């Protein structure tokens, strides 16, 4: 996990782009970014030699007591890493959006998967008491997540699920039978 990036911005900044290119040039296979307090895109980047790297630019907040609507949205990353006779690779990846639920009149916070979140829960989220947040809703969350994650995001399941080509991506052919982890 890394990246120090611009807070509250939904797209990678120049600092993230610099580190992404550096890690790609060093043969890194997967990067999971944090810090901006908002969800950012997930993508596969590649270099001119064909090396591919999976990048979660920012998972946003998993739990937050901040006072703005976008900061209530985060994500859980999941990927399948495979090691076989050809090396190590990422077979598929996923992002499950989550919503922070602040309870009115209590110092209690919990997290829901977006797929389990309802309009009733959204209308009861104490974020609605904060300035500029009275219109926080399930629809707001769904729209923002779709905007950030793009075409691979499945609104019907509230998930980003990507299966890669049969050989996976991020092949690390330097792996041997005695050395088994992706970088």
Can you annotate each of these PLM segments?
Residues 7-8:
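Active-site-proximal loop/hinge segments that shape catalytic or ion-binding/gating pockets
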Residues 14-75:
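Conserved beta-sheet core of the metallophosphoesterase superfamily
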Residues 69-183:
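A short C-terminal boundary segment appended to hydrolase-like catalytic domains
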